[in-house]
Amino acid sequence: MTTDKKDTRAEFDNIVNMTAKELRRWLDTDESKSVGQKSEGGGESTGHRSGRRIVDILEKNDLTDDDYAHMRKVVGYTHRHLEQRPSGDIVDSKWRYSLMNWGHDPLKP
């Protein structure tokens, strides 16, 4: 594994703080499906689709270059989104729900 891939994996593992099981369970909720940017025709949001891909990545051992590219996308998106934290209670916020679709629960230690 190259240094770049090791760094990507370490950053991904640091920012994705939900297990595959937790994320899969979350993605089945109405709250998960209620947030995120959807295409004109509706359907699944970008974040929800990413969450399903994250579950796959968390469960596999042999990662492809496409997997590493998605891991970098997850890290970048999550860092940007964390900077937009709203004021007040975030427990039931769309901001938190969106982050959880990307595998990061800001309420987890």
Please identify what each model-predicted range represents.
Residues 2-109:
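A charge-rich, low-complexity, intrinsically flexible signal that marks solvent-exposed coils, linkers
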